[in-house]
């Protein structure tokens, strides 16, 4: 069984890849949690735009993907993934997110939890992820 964080990561991967979403479960017997994952409006908006994200930053244990939803590259999505099989606390320079010039990182929140980004310093973010956890941010 997958944890809630792993389920969200699975959905984030599909959304950023613009992969077809298929629900193979029994809708009547599915948990409210699983239905909420499959019907999250923000995740569906990311998935349904038909654009595949590109890797913009990576290390052995961190992967960052981004895609733009407009030609001017002002709006889009960023996925930040803990690829380590255990809890992982790591810093990340804001510049690694390659945000558009006028985007304030203090306004970004995870689509699933509403959790804002945590700052370690003015130019550095701090992530404290559970095993295989990720965030999907809309900018």
What are the functions of these language-model segments?
Residues 14-17, 22, 58-99:
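Carbohydrate-binding surface patches
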Residues 118-139:
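C-terminal beta-strand-rich structural cap/linker in extracellular carbohydrate-active enzymes
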Residues 95-114:
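Solvent-exposed beta-hairpin/edge-strand motifs
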Residues 21, 28, 83-86, 113, ...:
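Short, glycine-/Ser/Thr-/acidic-enriched flexible segments
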Residues 80-82, 92-94, 110-112, 121, ...:
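Active-site proximal loops enriched in glycine and acidic residues that flank catalytic Cys/His/Asp
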Residues 1-49:
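Aromatic/acidic polysaccharide-binding cleft in carbohydrate-active enzymes
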Residues 16, 78, 108, 132, ...:
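Hydrophobic, well-ordered secondary-structure elements that form the walls
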Residues 34, 38-75:
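Membrane-interfacial catalytic/cofactor-binding modules of polytopic membrane enzymes
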